[in-house]
From Swiss-Prot:
The keyword Transmembrane applies. Keywords: Glycoprotein, Hydrogen ion transport, Ion channel, Ion transport, Membrane, Signal-anchor, Transmembrane, Transmembrane helix, Transport, Viral ion channel, Virion. It comes from Influenza B virus (strain B/USSR/100/1983). It is a single-pass type III membrane protein. It comes from the Viruses. The lineage of its organism: Viruses, Riboviria, Orthornavirae, Negarnaviricota, Polyploviricotina. This is Glycoprotein NB.
Amino acid sequence: MNNATFNHTNVNPISHIRGSVIITICVSFTVILTVFGYIAKIFTNKKNCTNNVIGLRERIKCSGCEPFCNKRDDISSPRTGVDIPSFILPGLNLSESTPN
């Protein structure tokens, strides 16, 4: 029974470090993809928002890009309050202050 002693100091530190590095790379890759996804969504919504078309002062309603639809010279629908981008709070539409 004395031969059944376990020595816990023989753990390979290189394999432990390698596992930690792999987990760190995977988490970092996921975070980077998420950030790039949000940036791509912002630019896609910004490109689709056109509210001054050939001199017409019309505010075109576009879902998901209300903060970018309100240009400086757009006076058709004045808005008050804090402008919260809809991609931060997808379930709440707090950026519109005018009732339907």
